[in-house]
A protein has these predicted regions:
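Conserved end of the kinase activation segment
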Residues: 185-195
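ATP-binding glycine-rich loop module of kinase domains
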Residues: 23-64
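Conserved activation segment of eukaryotic-like protein kinases, specifically the C-terminal portion
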Residues: 169-185
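Conserved short submotifs of the Hanks-type protein kinase catalytic core
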Residues: 83-97
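Catalytic-loop of the protein kinase fold
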Residues: 127-143
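AlphaC helix of the protein kinase catalytic domain
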Residues: 97-107
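Conserved HxN/HPN-centered segment at the entrance to the catalytic loop
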Residues: 69-78
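Activation segment signature within eukaryotic-like protein kinase domains
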Residues: 115-116
Length: 249
């Protein structure tokens, strides 16, 4: 970003938008909805490309992610917020989504396991920050060479500090996630923690191998047993954390 000062009375959100309009050119739009837009930008002084998110969201999630570097998460460069809206400038990951690959052909177990382990590394970092991704699915994984990158933090939230609250308070009040991949507790049945991401990852791993949800067609052998444990309805019966899942894989 250019080293220019804020205009007196200008919010950082307005300043950030002004800097973006001067330094970047919009190449294309990945997504546009009534209240959000995801654009691909090119820096005017180079060929480097970035993703710009313009949407409602939780700035604290992105601030936490700015503090880490992980090969399997996009780097968050800058953000600004105003009245519940966010502008987020993040790393552009070239490549196809995992959904694109699975739509073309199923993956060998070895390749599927490698991708799952890389997403486990991304989740290890997020869970270490106290974050739950809450929308792990093939369309939110970009494959760039041998690198798998978990994207889209619009559904991400912080884990609650006190998971065992009195009845009526120990559950999520906002339903987020994608049908088929979201853990049962994400539908307001219980409080969400990192085990919800393990459920989604288990479903995704099964889809990579069989093309279907594990409830309809479960992968065979040892990997099928790992997937079965990941996707238990009761979170207490799943792997307790992502490290244990990585060991199982």
């Amino acid at each position: 970003m250019a080293d220019e000062e804020l205009i007196p009375g200008e919010s950082y959100y307005a300043y950030f938008r002004r800097m973006l309009s001067g330094e970047f050119t919009e190449v294309s739009r990945f997504e546009e909805k009534a209240d959000s837009r995801i654009s691909l930008l090119r820096h005017n002084g180079s060929e480097q490309r970035f993703v710009l998110l313009d949407q409602p969201g939780d700035a604290a999630v992105y601030r936490s992610l700015m503090s880490v570097r992980c090969a399997h998460l996009p780097e968050i460069y800058e953000l600004a917020e105003e009245d519940g809206r966010l502008l987020v400038l993040e790393e552009f990951i070239p490549g196809d989504t995992l959904q694109d690959l699975v739509d073309c052909s199923l993956l060998p177990e070895k390749k599927a396991r490698e991708i799952a382990l890389q997403i486990c590394q991304a989740l290890y970092v997020m869970h270490g920050l106290g974050l739950v991704h809450r929308d792990v699915k093939p369309s939110n994984v970009v494959i760039h060479g041998d690198r798998a990158v978990l994207i889209d933090f619009s559904a991400s939230r912080f884990m609650k500090a006190f998971p065992d609250e009195p009845s009526g308070q120990g559950h999520d009040t906002v339903i987020l996630g994608s049908p088929g991949y979201a853990a049962p507790e994400q539908h307001g049945l219980a409080r969400t923690d990192g085990r919800a991401d393990l459920y989604s990852l288990g479903v995704m791993l099964n889809v990579m191998i069989t093309g279907d949800h594990p409830s309809r067609k479960l992968a065979g052998g040892r990997l099928g047993r790992v997937i079965s444990r990941c996707t238990m309805t009761n979170p207490k019966k799943r792997y307790s954390d992502v490290v244990h899942l990585m060991e199982a894989l």
